[in-house]
Regions:
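Thr-Gly-centered strand-to-loop micro-motif
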Residues: 145, 159, 213, 277-278, ...
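General small-molecule cofactor/ligand-binding pocket signal
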Residues: 234, 255, 332
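Short amphipathic alpha-helix with an adjacent loop that forms part of the alpha/beta core around
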Residues: 260-269
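ADP-ribose/adenylate-binding Rossmann-like module
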Residues: 236-237, 273-284, 289-315
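Adenosine-phosphate binding glycine-rich loop
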Residues: 298, 302-382
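Conserved SAM-binding strand-loop segment of SAM-dependent methyltransferases
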Residues: 252-258
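Short gly/pro/ser/thr-enriched loop/turn and capping motifs at secondary-structure boundaries
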Residues: 67, 240-243, 262, 306-310
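Segments forming oxygen-rich coordination pockets for charged ligands
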Residues: 2-252, 269-273, 315, 354, ...
Length: 382
């Protein structure tokens, strides 16, 4: 696995590495932020992988807990038992200032074992899932680390680990479904006669897909930035245009397609963000119609000025195709956020920034102009 930059990794890289470690039956621990009080660099659901054979991958803080987390991970790798540790980082003299670490963080550290398999199988199928993990227990029969995974079809999968008790699982069904739909995470308390449980409800979504229709030079930089931002990138070359993995080393798939068949390469419509950049009006028109009519992709970015989109709509009208308002709402043209940079690099950054904002249901504006928390606080029990 690539650990040249083990700290600045995406959720996609974390999931891919989890799968690779499981395939290798590696001895590893996983640290997960389960609860935060006050401010913290990472929110619930953030993960760090700590394999025995090398450096950690990922981050659960801005660096202020590296030593303690590594020590906890080493202990879990030896014991194969999950543990939850609370770190009070409000004491700046003890932990150091200036790192964004001034909240109280609850951290689950557990062994990488078969309890992760149901989640990894779902992600491999481009589906979301929710893991339910007991992080505090007043029931002696239910240990910390007991886990059940709920998948999109409603199945609840167990493992060699103890699972979440059936009565608690029933109480958590709605929270699990909401977390799966939104990709949110948090702790829910389940009151039970045999002892209350605090359960970490961790909704995990597969990586968003960035579909680039076109294989000109400008697509290379968009593919590079898209992969760095955590997208799984597909480059679809139009008609006879040359494109391969060597030309697009950052893409996860490179395919050749007719523009009317570009929808065939959409694997997860609800999480696919398409950009049409073939620089051919006819091909872009055909691809746009296919994506809007044959898929539910929420975002289709179109390169070029507004006038070009007007020409494209006129061409569609000539074929008796009129875009509905819901279809028009899915089109973004000119594509990208206004960064004020017209260079190829600036344009690519603008495109990926907009796709990222749409994928996260964010406006894409300046944080200084927003009120409240930078990241939304989620109550999974609501």
């Amino acid at each position: 696995m690539d650990r040249d930059d083990p700290w600045s990794v995406t959720d996609r890289s974390i999931h891919d590495t989890l799968a690779a470690l499981r395939d290798d039956e590696a001895n590893a621990a996983v640290a997960t932020v389960v609860d935060v009080e006050g401010s913290a660099y990472r929110r619930p659901g953030a993960k760090l992988l700590a394999p025995a054979d090398g450096d950690a991958l990922g981050a659960v803080t801005a660096g202020c807990l590296d030593g303690p987390v590594n020590s906890l991970a080493a202990g879990v790798r030896d014991s194969r038992e999950a543990t939850v540790e609370t770190f009070d980082l409000t004491d700046g003299e003890e932990w150091g200032l200036g790192l964004g670490c001034n909240g109280i963080i609850d951290l689950l550290v557990d062994p990488l074992d078969d309890s992760y398999d149901a989640l990894l199988d779902a992600l491999a199928d481009h589906e979301a899932a929710t893991t339910l993990t007991v992080v505090r227990s007043a029931d002696a029969a239910v240990p910390v680390g007991a886990r059940t995974t709920v998948t999109a079809d409603g199945d609840a999968s167990g493992s060699d680990r103890p699972g979440v008790p059936g009565d608690a699982l029933d109480a958590l069904r709605a929270s699990a479904e909401d977390a799966m739909a939104d990709g949110t995470s948090g702790v829910v308390t389940v009151e039970r006669e045999s002892g209350d449980l605090d359960v970490f409800v961790d909704g995990v979504e597969p990586a968003p897909e960035l579909l680039l229709f076109g294989s000109q030079n400008d697509a290379k930089t968009v593919a590079k930035f898209g992969a760095s931002a955590g997208f799984r990138v597909t480059v679809a070359s139009s008609r006879g245009a040359r494109a391969d993995g060597e030309q697009f080393p950052d893409a996860h798939r490179v395919v050749a397609t007719h523009p009317t068949e570009v929808a065939d390469h959409v694997r997860a419509p609800e999480r696919t963000y398409a950009v049409l950049m073939s620089h051919n009006l006819v091909d872009d028109r055909l691809a746009l119609e296919a994506l809007l009519r044959d898929t539910g992709v929420p975002y289709v970015g179109l390169m070029g000025p507004r006038e070009r989109f007007g020409e494209l709509r006129d061409a569609l009208a000539d074929d008796d195709v009129t875009l509905t308002q819901p279809e028009l709402d899915r089109v973004s043209t000119p594509v990208g956020l206004d960064l004020g940079d017209g260079s190829p690099t600036g344009i690519a950054l603008s495109i990926v920034a907009e796709a990222t904002a749409v994928a996260n249901d964010a406006a894409g504006g300046r944080l200084r102009e927003q009120s409240g928390h930078i990241h939304p606080r989620v109550d999974p029990s609501a």
